[in-house]
Amino acid sequence: MRWSCHPMSSVTSRLRSATADTFALVVYCFFTGMAIEILLSGMSLQQSLSSRVLAIPVNVIIAWPFGQYRDAVVSLASRHGPKQFWTRNLADLLAMSVFNHRSMRRFFLRWGWSGGSCSRRWSAMR
């Protein structure tokens, strides 16, 4: 019997894909978020570590839907654009930016964020 005919192979494949998406997003967001927080925002190492640890559950929740969305965007870009390295990277960047913007907006609105408080804080930092 071939593995592809096994009834559990698609379940196993989806589970493996979801696990890979989750691990990749958590690790990527941990290190890039930490770099942004320390280098651009001026947070201390302790503040950044605390922030990154608190962000892990959110990243775990959005990892599988993001993986599906990213695969669709990259596939669409490779079908309709030149098959070059930069096309895939730009599609990956676009998928990350669009997906994260929408998911973080929902998260912040759910927990009571307001644009006014953010703009006041930004003005005070200048």
From Swiss-Prot:
One of its GO terms (molecular function) is L-amino acid efflux transmembrane transporter activity. GO terms for cellular component: plasma membrane. It is a single-pass membrane protein. The gene is alaE. GO terms for biological process: amino acid export across plasma membrane. This is L-alanine exporter AlaE. Keywords: Amino-acid transport, Cell inner membrane, Cell membrane, Membrane, Transmembrane, Transmembrane helix, Transport. Its main location: membrane. Exports L-alanine. It is found in: Cell inner membrane. It comes from the Bacteria. The chain crosses the membrane at residues 23-43. Pfam families: AlaE. InterPro entries: Ala_export_AlaE. Belongs to the AlaE exporter family.
